A protein has these predicted regions:
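Noncatalytic, beta-rich nucleic-acid-contacting surfaces in large DNA/RNA-processing enzymes
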Residues: 1-499
């Protein structure tokens, strides 16, 4: 359709040439991406594998009348203006409102309303605040389409990797053994857990997911260590565990650790509940209603219902019922699939194009968290700073961001790669470059130097190279304190004070 990469059909094979196909409708295959490669029995062509088994009713209700919100993720540097213009053209500007009274950069929400609601145009828009409407959200959402548009860092990283390597991320297979292995161990990266533990002193790291969006946090790494996912559908499960409430801790984790069930059976998304019940012979309406109750943390029963008796009559196991009762919020499956697809593509680059991976990661995620005075001084300096942060009783958000950045840098050094010093002649404003087999940091890595100031330096340098510190200060529009920091970092070595 061109709308999304996520195929909601059950897991299946299809021949791209003669269109022979085979569907697995019994729930035995978690994702079409996990199917083994096969050639078409009719014409011999390699079969295409897809399908994630997302019932339409999860989005639109059993009768298809529910109006739900949709999310559009786009690359950060795509530009909000371009996205807005496209939405105006697609939906019609006279039928679109921005809802809420606060605008968050990189995230916008819109309502598409039908022709009969043109009265809103006169009374309830607030110009020039981007056509913002201030109705009570719950009073109108059932009659309008909600569209959320978000700039996405993970997609931006994939885009950056494509630019750096020329490799189309859509050509990367989702069953690559080495890429999948980083979610279980760091072997494919050539690093042992003991080497990582020697540097990262605030917790063990046995998996290779440092820096992978959605799978690199301490919590996510802990889930991966417990689960040891072996295929794509299990990565989707892990993503659901991360986003749900009452889904992993004291629930799915215990079921897996106690060998009650395998990971493929435990609940991690809304679709897991509905599909499991349907495959056990429970009526579609009951399966849907139970799923709706469970996802909202309301248990199994509705008012005047007797769903529990229906589940018991269908021989739904007690562990499943107990698991449903513990859940307070259950996420949808599609965002978990998107998260797993994006992370696995990035993991492929981490294994096969490591320098490009680290360049893209630091370009997208470093921001003000790249402590150049620590990171550029090598592994010993990084280890010392991580130990200092680990010893703090109360970690601030800045401490956590700095630690995450240093951990990825340390991993890079352990894999035999290094940073160059920031170069007055070659560094970019905000992007890390690959130079002579090493990473060249941008100007915004200099402490207290923001993106705008970094851009001014590059703009002035492109006119002609700086001839002195005074020239840099004047044309580059930097303060004396920044000049002092650059001197301390060795960036201005050989540059005279005056012309």
């Amino acid at each position: 359709s061109g709308i999304t990469e996520i195929n909601p059909l059950p897991s299946h094979y299809v021949c791209p040439k003669c269109h022979w196909n085979h569907f697995y409708t019994d729930g035995s295959v978690g994702s079409g991406f996990d199917l083994p490669d096969h050639n078409c029995p009719e014409c011999g062509t390699l079969l295409y594998k897809d399908g994630h088994d997302i019932p339409y009713s999860v989005l639109f209700g059993l009768d298809g009348t529910n109006i739900k919100g949709f999310g559009l993720a786009f690359v950060q540097d795509a530009g909000l203006d371009e996205v807005y213009k496209y939405m105006e053209k697609l939906l019609g500007r006279e039928h679109v409102l921005c809802y809420g009274d606060k605008l968050i950069p990189g995230s916008e929400k819109f309502l598409k309303y039908p022709d009969v609601c043109k009265c809103l145009n006169a009374k309830d828009r607030r110009w020039p605040a981007n056509s913002t409407v201030r109705f009570n959200y719950h009073s109108i959402i059932d009659d309008m389409l909600s569209l959320t548009m978000n700039g996405n860092d993970a997609l931006t990283m994939v885009h950056e990797l494509q630019n750096l390597t020329g490799i189309n991320p859509q050509s990367i297979p989702f069953n690559d053994a080495r890429a999948l292995s980083v979610f279980c161990s760091a072997d494919a990266l050539g690093i042992t857990p003991s080497k990582l533990a020697d540097v990262i002193v605030n917790g063990k790291v046995t998996v290779g997911t440092l820096g992978l969006p959605g799978y690199g946090t301490p919590f996510a790494r802990g889930v991966l260590e417990d689960v040891q996912p072996k295929n794509f559908s299990e990565l989707v499960k892990v993503s659901g565990f991360r986003h749900g409430t009452g889904v992993w801790v004291n629930n799915a984790r215990d079921l897996i650790k106690n060998d009650t069930v395998k990971i493929e059976e435990v609940i991690s998304t809304r679709e897991d509940v509905m599909n499991y019940l349907i495959h056990h012979g429970v009526e579609s309406l009951t399966s849907f209603t139970v799923m709706e109750n469970v996802r909202k943390g309301k248990g199994i029963e509705s008012k005047r219902s007797n769903h529990l008796a229906e589940l018991e009559a269908a021989h739904v196991p007690q562990w499943f019922i107990d698991s449903c009762l513990k859940i307070r919020y259950l996420p949808p499956k599609a965002p978990s699939i998107f998260s797993a697809m994006t992370a696995l593509r990035i993991a492929w680059f981490k294994v096969y194009q490591p320098l490009a991976y680290y360049a893209a990661y630091f370009t997208v995620y470093a921001g003000g968290a790249f402590n150049a005075t620590v990171i550029l001084n090598g592994l010993a300096s990084q280890k010392q700073e991580l130990a200092r942060i680990a010893a703090l009783k109360h970690l601030t958000a800045v401490d956590k961001d700095n630690a995450a950045m240093i951990e990825v840098a340390a991993e890079m050094y352990l894999r035999g790669m290094e940073f160059l010093p920031v170069s007055l002649e070659k560094s970019e404003a905000t992007a890390f470059k690959i130079e002579d087999g090493k990473l060249l940091p941008p100007f915004n890595c200099i402490p207290a130097l923001g993106n705008a100031a970094a851009g001014e330096i590059v703009k002035a340098r492109n006119e002609h190279l700086f001839t002195s510190k005074a020239d840099l200060k004047k044309r580059g529009k930097v303060s004396q304190s920044i000049i002092d920091t650059m001197e301390y970092m060795g960036i201005l070595k050989g540059l005279p004070g005056e012309d």
